[in-house]
A protein has these predicted regions:
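Short, well-ordered beta-strand elements
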Residues: 30-43, 89-92, 111-114, 158-160, ...
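Sec-dependent signal peptide recognition
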Residues: 2-9
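Gly/Pro-rich hinge or "lid" segments in bacterial periplasmic/extracellular proteins
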Residues: 162-201
Length: 201
C-alpha cells in the first residue's frame, strides 16, 4: 500500500512539474477596430482647431498628458505630476517610451514646441484654456516672444508657470488643445495622419 501511495505521489508531482514547465503559447495579435458614427461634415482632426463633433474622435487617435475620467484624472503620457504649494507651478515628468505612430520619439520638448505652435497658429475657441499659462495670451497676441512664456523643459520634465493658482490644472491639460502635434499632419489625408493614441483612422 505504501509503495502505491509513493508511486501515486510521484506521478502527481511529475504532472504538476510538467504543467509548470509548459510555456504558454504567444497570444495571437488581433487587430482592434473601433467603429463610431459621426455626423456628415469635413473632418480635419487637428487638435489646434477642431469642432465639437471631432473631439470624441480626437481623443481616440491622440493622447495628451492626462485624461479625465469619471473616477478622476488618469496619467497618460506622464509618470507623475508635481505642483508648488500655491498651485502656480506644475511639473509633468513624461514617460520615456512615448512615440508617434511613425516611431518618432515624443519628449517634453515635443509638448513645449506644440503648445507654443498652438498659441502662435490656432484660432480655436478652446485657445482660452492656454491663456492660464504665464505670458500665453500676450504671446498669442504677438506682444511678447516665446521665451517669455511660462514654459520650460528640464530633462524630460515640462514645467508650466501659471498666472493664477489652478488646483485642477492636471484636469485642465486633458483638453485636446494641449495635445502634442505634428505640423506635417496639416497636409496629410485622414488615413495618413501621424498620431500617438490607441487608434488610427
Amino acid at each position: 500500500m505504501k509503495i502505491f501511495k509513493l508511486l501515486l505521489i510521484s506521478i502527481l508531482s511529475f504532472l504538476l512539474f510538467a504543467c509548470g514547465e509548459e510555456k504558454p503559447e504567444e497570444a495571437e495579435k488581433v487587430e482592434q477596430i473601433f467603429y463610431t458614427v459621426m455626423p456628415r461634415q469635413e473632418y480635419k482632426l487637428n487638435p489646434q482647431s477642431y469642432s465639437e463633433n471631432e473631439r470624441a474622435l480626437l481623443t481616440q487617435i491622440f493622447e495628451g498628458l492626462t485624461e479625465l475620467k469619471t473616477d478622476g484624472v488618469r496619467l497618460i503620457s506622464v509618470l507623475n505630476i508635481e505642483h508648488s504649494d500655491d498651485y502656480k507651478e506644475w511639473t509633468f515628468t513624461l514617460r520615456d517610451d512615448l512615440k508617434w505612430s511613425d516611431g518618432e520619439k515624443i519628449t517634453a520638448d515635443t509638448y513645449l514646441d506644440s503648445w507654443l505652435d498652438t498659441l502662435e497658429n490656432s484660432r480655436s475657441d478652446e485657445i482660452y484654456r492656454m491663456f492660464v499659462v504665464k505670458g500665453a495670451k500676450d504671446f498669442y497676441n504677438k506682444k511678447i516672444n516665446k521665451n517669455s512664456v511660462g514654459l520650460k523643459v528640464q530633462d524630460n520634465k515640462l514645467i508650466v508657470s501659471l498666472n493664477t493658482p489652478i488646483k485642477n490644472f492636471d484636469e485642465w491639460v486633458s483638453n485636446p488643445i494641449f495635445y502634442p502635434i505634428r505640423k506635417e499632419n496639416i497636409n496629410l489625408s485622414l488615413d495618413k495622419k501621424i498620431v500617438n493614441g490607441a487608434f488610427k483612422v
